[in-house]
């Protein structure tokens, strides 16, 4: 068992160190990993797959699968052994949270480790499925059709989106550690997780729980239109001519209807109005409202003098600079609210990213318009350039259409072998020179 001799114990130690960093210190005296045909967890002991070929070589998929399953099964000591949720009722609180911490641990193992759960783009194919093939994460575990994505991948992805895109690493990590601390050796429900994350972070995340956990809507934000304008510092006078208009005399400000309270207050002999008790409070408008003040009702003539542009080109640039104004219109076609992540590519080849919080959708969840002010002329715009939001349709994310791989190319990119198997010949068996350490 060369793979286990080389990696198992070190992966166990790495897992305990990583999970302790993101949750609470490991409280048990031991953690054991045993080689078996598949993965299964118990307190302080787990069984994991990953065997070499008869000649002692192994595929990359076998090695990575073995490392991943050891991390996952050892991680179950934290979820659900220590933070003891009910897996039969809420599988995602066990498998989903553990898959999220597994992802963090794999990322800290090797920056090139081929993770399968966690990154937003990995969940896109699942989110694209027809609605009749999807259930909310909050569905009872016995009724889940797509068990793997629903209980493992989607919850892990949601937490990663919160950490990387919505809350930020520092705030999310603090809140998640607080959840683990508060609910260690207790029996939390989903509400306890949601409440603790909000309470510890001070963030209102209702919109995210509702969209990601209680709904099946995908993220599909489109960039519909781009309008832009630049300050013209070379124009001559843009002044106005002298204008005159009539301003009528303002009428008394009165309610257009005496409601029941006003009528009853007048009839109530026990009520004495302040302006009756102290007549010094009665000013001109008290009398005017009652028709007791005589005024000249003829309109007043107002003259607005001509206004001319007296600024030079240099003065205009000094005041406003060389600015470009871009008005972008976005549509929420998928239904799931997400932050707007806008990447600008300017004509000089430089790039810049703006991040707009999801709260921009609070008044209209279907369409929003946002204006950006830039110092350079834009060449192209792209939404979600790092694929953080699990957007299911990237074709409507750009201004200046970009090419997309054909379906055949996408299929080739997604092809992978079965669990623990490679999708090609074993390169370890074909080594002809010793690799450089």
Task: Locate each region found by the language model.
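Hydrophobic, well-ordered secondary-structure elements that form the walls
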Residues: 98, 159, 209, 381, ...
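Compositionally biased low-complexity segments at domain edges in trafficked proteins
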Residues: 410-437
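Juxtacatalytic substrate-recognition/specificity segment
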Residues: 1-77, 81-91, 97-101, 105-110, ...
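Short acidic/polar inter-strand loop motif in beta-rich domains
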Residues: 385-399
């Amino acid at each position: 068992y060369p793979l286990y001799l080389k990696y198992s114990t070190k992966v166990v130690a790495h897992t305990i160190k990583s999970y302790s960093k993101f949750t609470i210190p490991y409280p048990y005296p031991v953690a054991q990993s045993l080689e078996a045909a598949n993965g299964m967890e118990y307190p302080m002991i787990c069984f994991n797959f990953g065997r070499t070929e008869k000649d002692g070589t192994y595929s990359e998929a076998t090695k990575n699968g073995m490392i991943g399953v050891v991390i996952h099964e050892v991680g179950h000591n934290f979820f659900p052994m220590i933070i003891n949720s009910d897996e039969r009722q809420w599988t995602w609180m066990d498998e989903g949270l553990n898959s999220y911490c597994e992802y963090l641990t794999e990322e800290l193992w090797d920056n090139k480790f081929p993770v399968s759960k966690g990154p937003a783009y990995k969940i896109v194919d699942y989110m694209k499925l027809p609605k009749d093939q999807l259930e909310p994460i909050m569905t009872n575990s016995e009724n889940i059709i797509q068990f793997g994505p629903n209980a493992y991948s989607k919850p892990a992805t949601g937490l990663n989106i919160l950490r990387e895109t919505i809350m930020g690493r520092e705030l999310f990590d603090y809140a998640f550690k607080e959840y683990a601390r508060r609910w260690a050796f207790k029996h939390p429900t989903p509400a306890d997780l949601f409440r603790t994350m909000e309470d510890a972070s001070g963030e209102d995340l209702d919109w995210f729980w509702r969209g990601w956990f209680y709904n099946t809507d995908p993220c599909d934000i489109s960039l519909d239109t781009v309008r832009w304008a630049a300050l013209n510092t070379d124009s001559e006078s843009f002044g106005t001519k002298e204008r005159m208009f009539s301003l009528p005399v303002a009428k008394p400000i009165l309610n257009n209807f005496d409601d029941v309270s006003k009528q009853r207050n007048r009839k109530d002999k026990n009520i004495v109005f302040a302006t009756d008790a102290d007549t010094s409070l009665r000013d001109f408008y008290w009398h005017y409202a009652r028709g007791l003040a005589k005024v000249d009702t003829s309109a007043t003539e107002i003259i607005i003098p001509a206004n001319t542009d007296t600024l030079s080109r240099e003065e205009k640039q000094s005041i406003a600079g060389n600015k470009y104004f871009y008005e972008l219109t976005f549509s929420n076609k998928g239904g799931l609210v997400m932050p707007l992540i806008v990447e600008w590519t300017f004509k000089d080849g430089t790039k810049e990213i703006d991040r707009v919080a999801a709260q921009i959708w609070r008044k209209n969840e279907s369409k929003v318009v946002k204006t950006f002010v830039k110092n350079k002329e834009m060449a192209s715009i792209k939404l979600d350039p790092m694929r953080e939001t699990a957007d299911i349709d990237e074709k409507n994310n750009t201004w200046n259409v970009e090419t997309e791989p054909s379906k055949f190319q996408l299929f080739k990119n997604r092809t992978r072998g079965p669990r623990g198997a490679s999708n090609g010949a074993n390169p370890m068996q074909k080594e002809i020179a010793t690799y450089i350490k």
